[in-house]
Amino acid sequence: MEKYDDIKYLSLLAKQYPTIAAASTEIINLEAILNLPKGTEHFLADLHGEYEPFVHVLKNGSGAIKRKIQEVFENSLMDCEKRSLTTLVYYPEQKLEIVLREEKDINDWYKINLYRLIELCRHVSSKYTRSKVRKALPPDFSYIIEELLHEESDNNDKQGYYDGIINTIIEIERAQEFIVALSKLIQRLVIDRLHIIGDIFDRGPRPDIILDTLINYHSVDIQWGNHDILWMGAASGNTTCIANVLRIAARYSNLDVIEDIYGINLLPLATFALKHYKNDNCIAFVPKNTDETLYGASEIELISKMHKAITIIQFKLEYEIIKRRPEFNMDHRLLLDKINYSDGTITLNNITYELCDKSFPTININNPFELTSDEKKLVSKLQISFINSDKLQKHVLFLFNKGRLYLTYNSNLLFHGCIPLNKDKTFKSMTIHGEEYKGKKLLDKFDSLAREGYFSTRGSAEKLYGIDIMWYLWTGACSSLFGKEDMTTFERYFIKDKSTHKEKKNPYYNFRDSEEMCNMIFEEFGLDPAESRIINGHVPVKNKFGENPIKCNGKLIVIDGGFAKAYRSQTGLAGYTLTYNSYGLQLISHQPFKSIEDAFSKETDILSSTQIVEKLDRKKVGDTDIGKELKNQIKDLKLLLKAYRKGLINEVR
């Protein structure tokens, strides 16, 4: 570059900055940005469809908004006033409805709270450039908000101007809309970047609300979880993934998500189940956590039959992938042919177990993995429904566009489950298309194959292999998302002996306190071991039994703390979140969240406690990944200035 061997590139840059003055101004702007405080990052994991606590934690920035209100109004507002202001920022529309019913002098209330919101907004926007704040402003009020943010209300020369704006907003009956706009702007400015470290989907009631919220969020990235990849595979047309998704939904009485939210017709499955399992009580398939106020006995009976029907279909479909892909090394998971159908037993590892359920009306004992003609028709109908669900396709496309298997960002390595290892602490390898992959290369290969599975032409070999890989990522021993040797689905349904249910974790989990392992992973992913951290979820932290989410002297942080209600008996909490601001890292542990309605009607907040993971000298933008990009831009602009001044490129005035 110094020898101007890349004049072509500089000529292109000159179109954007056609004069010395323009290039100089941009250099000054970029240098100034480098000295601003680093924006706040917010980390969440393992949401499992639990939309209410997710929405609340997103709105409160894991306590960041409450802290900002305390900083601004510590000595000027009473605790009850701070609490009321906090609720207004979180839930402006709902809070306004209550205020309008109860407040006698609404114009006075408007005036007081508009001043408070402007002061708070001024505080949270102070770490950003005017340009960045301007881009975040709601279009309807952008000019007015910008004026108010940059005018001090105690400036005597402008006091009348400032007050005039507020009074006019109230007078023309735009105060409600303005309060909503300011509140949402504050929420947006408090968090600069959101990281979702997997498992948006699972057994929770409304993963769709979570995804719709994320689609509209200003800055987000996603690291796929094992449940996410399962739904992604289903949306891509993998019938085994479809069967798994339906089985889990039936198991947890969550078929409403499939039928009502994603518009997938389950009547063919219900009809099939009633026909073929009519005289089967399906006792081992009664759904868990059924709310008797929502489901009658006949509905539970139907779901149980659907549950069993799709489970048997799943086992048959898995055979097709396992035989098609010998490199998956999963023949040992084919169990339907190991059953002794005459006495209802199965022999595993030389031990014979009696089956809990001995009724198999759709299995041909001479060819147990063969789909019946009715099963084939059903699977085809379900596949068409999943592929043609517009809402599901929109959500899965978003997961591909904003997601990946892992992310390196500001010296943090983010992934959902694990980096597959061997017992000797070396990277576990897998052969794909005759080539061996391990470590970062394995995850990169998985990522690209999953994308081929979704985006390739239907019927192509690339499409088929890609969707098979998505199923493997759900259940395979080398999957960074699954993180175990085997998924014992059959054993959990059909064998009472719980020793057969155990799923052996990848050795990665035994080494999470090993600095040697963490450093090896950092080097593999091109990160500096002295400055980097691993942040992941997937395995609930058993806080109530004394497990610490901060491992390996702070080099590894696990933030699966129990957003999913099913895991709270293990964790003793209702979730961990993490924030990383200019002062360092804070781990926040959350108690169970009652409801959004309770939050705005009673001004309750989720009870949380904060633990400082790492305190830093104040980090600036220049210390971040964005800072590195800006420094490269500055370097190029300085070269452009040289080219202008040496006459190698002409200014265009």
Swiss-Prot record:
Pathway annotation: Carbohydrate biosynthesis; gluconeogenesis
GO BP annotation list: gluconeogenesis
Cofactors demanded by this protein: Mn(2+)
UniProt key word rRNA-binding: no
Keywords: Carbohydrate metabolism, Hydrolase, Manganese
SUPFAM superfamilies the record matches: Metallo-dependent phosphatases
Catalytic activity: beta-D-fructose 1,6-bisphosphate + H2O = beta-D-fructose 6-phosphate + phosphate
Coiled coil ranges: none
Documented EC number(s): 3.1.3.11
GO molecular-function term, one example from the UniProt record: fructose 1,6-bisphosphate 1-phosphatase activity
InterPro entries: FBPtase_class3, Metallo-depent_PP-like
Protein family (similarity comment): Belongs to the FBPase class 3 family.
Record-given protein name: Fructose-1,6-bisphosphatase class 3 2
Organism: Clostridium beijerinckii (strain ATCC 51743 / NCIMB 8052)
Gene: fbp2
